[in-house]
């Protein structure tokens, strides 16, 4: 019986992936997969004006204070890169491969952005500071430990996105701090409009997003996976977080009659095969309707698992709605 990893295992798995990391599996819930999520509220396409600021309390209650608009920003995880791209800003240095995606900078221009050595889990402080950043943005539960070493030399902002609403909030916050208010409002409007359009014609199909590098796969749940938080609006998505120790077996997934599967393969160094290919070794895999009908989609993990921002989520919506038709 194959089981998805716990939050601890997921954090360990994704921390080993070069470039970025998924957030953990989320808040506790002992409810079974058959418990349907509550109907998602309709997306409001109204965008409130963004006011430029040098000090603010972010969408998660963290206080951020700068002396002036930041010009040199170092990104330690992909949401930062996503937001900066939406705002028309290129990071001074990054720790993500997202910028190489054609809908971001593309491979050639992305090569011009310096990469912070040390990997996602342990970016080198000296390398970060060598870029003389005005602002360093990282993932709270991974990079928060860097705060003492960066204190006094730069401003460190720890983000912790769990839902698409969080990502929109961070977009607005960074737009305010950089003075790119018009760009922020435009990006938010574009995303909200796309999401509202997608939810007007939801699919009746049952969908599932899984992630991992081997048979110990994980299930992305709407409570704390940003891409998955979109799915209750556009499909039947009956997967809920089971907390730190929770997991889903392949038998449970089979029982849900999944029509469309989205697979995020998280590789360790050199690619050693797709997750869907590895799961195919289990005889239960072939019995899942999505597998049987050829509706398994290997997606780009840089966008689906790591991007988290409005540009990445727009791509997720485009790809997901096309597959769910």
Predicted segments with their positions:
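Short helix-initiation/N-cap motifs at beta->coil->alpha
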Residues: 59-61, 116-125, 242-249
